[in-house]
């Protein structure tokens, strides 16, 4: 006679008539498996199997001390860590640590009193200049050079003003557009495949040990402010840029593999 196959729910109910069986857990390699039993909205008994990856993390002494506090109430006999039966995890809050330069908004920002909103000095958009997606790009350089060219042109019109006149504006020099000259990107590298949580501080920590740099640009989404996944770093010396490509290309960072290459000219 063939044995009758029964479901796991019938077997559990036969062993634990008065209530739910206790939770079970076991560790296999770097994973921990937890099996729990509970009732769903329809009053049916269900089994929930959760898988956790064990990860060692260095924390401060205060955090380690809090984890050793004695639990109380319904969780008095629980093991270390939260219990889904008695603990509800709150919404995770992400903090963005900004450098001191990003707080210097006094000379960077313009406020429109009519609308009471921020006005970007780079693209004239309705956002702070420090959050402008065009910051550090050709548009940013063009805006600054236009202001300088306007002031210099006014000085040319008045030869008795005694103000300094740039060579490119003297005697009808060239086109009057200094930004039209080719920018030197020989020591610039492009870092791609960055995570959305990447910040300027993280980028600074990533490249500062390789060599001195003159400028960095981290591309961000216009609406969310999250990283677009790539950044540009202009090193002071070309050999440092070559070393950055050799060291960081294929390097694992924040669970992603970085791709580092020479920055291509804008006309390509």
Swiss-Prot record:
The lineage of its organism: Eukaryota, Metazoa, Ecdysozoa, Arthropoda, Hexapoda. This is Eukaryotic translation initiation factor 3 subunit G-2. The gene is eIF3g2. Component of the eukaryotic translation initiation factor 3 (eIF-3) complex. The eIF-3 complex interacts with pix. InterPro entries: eIF3_g, eIF3g_N, eIF3G_RRM, Nucleotide-bd_a/b_plait_sf, RBD_domain_sf, RRM_dom. RNA-binding component of the eukaryotic translation initiation factor 3 (eIF-3) complex, which is involved in protein synthesis of a specialized repertoire of mRNAs and, together with other initiation factors, stimulates binding of mRNA and methionyl-tRNAi to the 40S ribosome. The eIF-3 complex specifically targets and initiates translation of a subset of mRNAs involved in cell proliferation. This subunit can bind 18S rRNA. Its main location: cytoplasm. GO terms for molecular function: RNA binding; translation initiation factor activity. Residues 187-265 form the RRM domain. It comes from Drosophila willistoni (Fruit fly). One of its GO terms (biological process) is formation of cytoplasmic translation initiation complex.
